[in-house]
Amino acid sequence: MTKKTVRVRFAPSPTGPLHVGGVRTALFNYLFSKKNSGKFILRIEDTDSKRKVDGAEDYILKCLSWCGIDIDEGPYRQSERKSLYQKNISLLIKKGNAYFAFDTEEELKALRSESEKKGETFVYNWQNRKSLKNSLSMTAAEVEKSLQKKKSFVVRFKTPKNKIIKTRDIIRGSTSIDSNLLDDKILIKADGTPTYHFANVVDDKEMEITHVIRGEEWLPSLALHTMLYDAFKWAAPSFAHLPLCLLYTSDAADDFTS
């Protein structure tokens, strides 16, 4: 059997200067690719145009070059891959793993407030889907009418009910979580752009990424990403979530010792 070429990616958002933690993540990816005679890919995650900073991408490229981190492929830009996300979200909806949700932000805010008064947390999932405004509770004719009228909507992932989601991380080991505790995450926002979670999984599949090496702030997202791979019936890459770089300060040290 032919051994699969190692392919890793560094995927910063052009929202400002590249910080030390980002450079460290890039370095881990770069060194892992070189150790395994693989490819280091740069992907610019720029779907959030409101947060995009002019010149940030050039700054990222200069920083990587200054650090001696050579790019084998890229930079790829998510803003130039919208048709790919539309194709895959249509596939996911057709498979029954995602759905249109027409609830307004005001309506959801009211539901959250109502839950808070009861000492509860509002979670949009299998427990209340049928009572909310979405393509799972509406008739096909109602959904079509809403789409034709161009009513604002998002596309949500249909989190499976009563399922133990098992995940595997190279650093953290195996974990599991009850799907009933999870919400139906938004995959496509009201403006038509993909969320980080959806674009991330689609891009990693299309770019044939074998190892996802990223900061541990993304560890809570691993269950969702695992479910997305399962829904598409795609083989998931190996995951490694790196401990964060924390700033040492005298105040922090005093708090710790006290």
Where are these regions (language model features)?
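Hydrophobic transmembrane-helix microenvironments that flank and shape a buried ionizable site
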Residues: 16, 181, 251-252
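Single conserved hydrophobic/aromatic residue that forms the stacking wall/gate
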Residues: 248-258
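Active-site cores that bind ATP or allylic diphosphates and position pyrophosphate for catalysis
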Residues: 94, 100, 104-241, 246-247
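Short intrinsically disordered, low-complexity segments
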Residues: 30, 197, 256-257
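N-terminal Rossmann-like or analogous alpha/beta NTP/dinucleotide-binding catalytic cores
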Residues: 2-121, 191, 220-234
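Single, functionally critical "micro-switch" positions that shape active/binding sites
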Residues: 18, 95, 202-203, 253-254
